[in-house]
UniProtKB/Swiss-Prot annotation:
The keyword Heme does not apply. Keywords: Ribonucleoprotein, Ribosomal protein, RNA-binding, rRNA-binding. GO terms for molecular function: small ribosomal subunit rRNA binding; structural constituent of ribosome. One of its GO terms (cellular component) is small ribosomal subunit. Belongs to the bacterial ribosomal protein bS20 family. NCBIfam families: S20 (TIGR00029). Gene3D superfamilies: Ribosomal protein S20 (1.20.58.110). The lineage of its organism: Bacteria, Pseudomonadati, Pseudomonadota, Betaproteobacteria, Nitrosomonadales. This is Small ribosomal subunit protein bS20.
Amino acid sequence: MANTAQAKKRVRQTATRRERNFGLRSKLRTAIKGVRKAVAAGDKNVAEVVFRKAVSVIDSVASKGIIHKNKASRHKSRLSGAVKAMG
Protein backbone atom coordinates (compact mmCIF):
# COMPACT_ATOMS: atom_id res chain seq x y z
CA MET A 1 0.00 0.00 0.00
CA ALA A 2 1.08 3.57 -0.64
CA ASN A 3 2.94 5.10 2.29
CA THR A 4 3.84 8.63 1.23
CA ALA A 5 1.43 11.41 0.39
CA GLN A 6 2.79 11.50 -3.15
CA ALA A 7 2.23 7.76 -3.61
CA LYS A 8 -1.33 8.05 -2.29
CA LYS A 9 -2.05 10.88 -4.70
CA ARG A 10 -0.62 8.87 -7.60
CA VAL A 11 -2.94 5.97 -6.70
CA ARG A 12 -5.93 8.34 -6.80
CA GLN A 13 -4.84 9.84 -10.11
CA THR A 14 -4.28 6.42 -11.65
CA ALA A 15 -7.74 5.24 -10.60
CA THR A 16 -9.36 8.36 -12.09
CA ARG A 17 -7.47 8.01 -15.36
CA ARG A 18 -8.25 4.31 -15.56
CA GLU A 19 -11.99 4.95 -15.23
CA ARG A 20 -11.87 7.74 -17.81
CA ASN A 21 -9.85 5.64 -20.25
CA PHE A 22 -12.18 2.67 -19.78
CA GLY A 23 -15.20 4.82 -20.65
CA LEU A 24 -13.55 6.28 -23.74
CA ARG A 25 -12.39 2.86 -24.91
CA SER A 26 -15.93 1.56 -24.46
CA LYS A 27 -17.30 4.46 -26.52
CA LEU A 28 -14.75 3.62 -29.23
CA ARG A 29 -15.78 -0.03 -29.38
CA THR A 30 -19.47 0.92 -29.49
CA ALA A 31 -18.87 3.33 -32.39
CA ILE A 32 -16.97 0.69 -34.37
CA LYS A 33 -19.67 -1.91 -33.74
CA GLY A 34 -22.30 0.57 -34.91
CA VAL A 35 -20.59 0.95 -38.28
CA ARG A 36 -20.12 -2.80 -38.64
CA LYS A 37 -23.79 -3.37 -37.82
CA ALA A 38 -24.94 -0.76 -40.36
CA VAL A 39 -22.72 -2.30 -43.04
CA ALA A 40 -24.08 -5.78 -42.26
CA ALA A 41 -27.64 -4.45 -42.50
CA GLY A 42 -26.84 -3.11 -45.97
CA ASP A 43 -28.11 0.45 -45.45
CA LYS A 44 -25.48 2.66 -47.05
CA ASN A 45 -26.94 6.02 -45.94
CA VAL A 46 -27.09 4.98 -42.30
CA ALA A 47 -23.62 3.43 -42.56
CA GLU A 48 -22.14 6.70 -43.87
CA VAL A 49 -23.71 8.75 -41.08
CA VAL A 50 -22.59 6.31 -38.39
CA PHE A 51 -19.13 6.13 -39.99
CA ARG A 52 -18.67 9.91 -39.72
CA LYS A 53 -19.58 9.81 -36.03
CA ALA A 54 -17.24 6.86 -35.49
CA VAL A 55 -14.34 8.71 -37.14
CA SER A 56 -14.92 11.59 -34.75
CA VAL A 57 -14.81 9.24 -31.76
CA ILE A 58 -11.72 7.45 -33.09
CA ASP A 59 -9.85 10.74 -33.60
CA SER A 60 -10.88 11.96 -30.17
CA VAL A 61 -9.64 8.82 -28.44
CA ALA A 62 -6.38 8.86 -30.41
CA SER A 63 -5.71 12.51 -29.58
CA LYS A 64 -6.10 11.71 -25.87
CA GLY A 65 -3.54 8.92 -26.13
CA ILE A 66 -5.95 6.08 -25.35
CA ILE A 67 -4.99 4.37 -28.62
CA HIS A 68 -2.03 4.99 -30.90
CA LYS A 69 -2.55 7.23 -33.93
CA ASN A 70 -1.60 4.39 -36.28
CA LYS A 71 -4.25 2.16 -34.73
CA ALA A 72 -6.77 4.95 -35.19
CA SER A 73 -5.80 5.26 -38.85
CA ARG A 74 -6.12 1.51 -39.29
CA HIS A 75 -9.63 1.50 -37.79
CA LYS A 76 -10.73 4.42 -39.98
CA SER A 77 -9.26 2.86 -43.11
CA ARG A 78 -10.93 -0.50 -42.59
CA LEU A 79 -14.29 0.99 -41.69
CA SER A 80 -14.09 3.33 -44.68
CA GLY A 81 -13.32 0.40 -46.96
CA ALA A 82 -16.28 -1.54 -45.61
CA VAL A 83 -18.64 1.39 -46.19
CA LYS A 84 -17.31 2.07 -49.69
CA ALA A 85 -17.58 -1.61 -50.64
CA MET A 86 -21.33 -1.46 -50.08
CA GLY A 87 -21.81 -0.16 -53.59
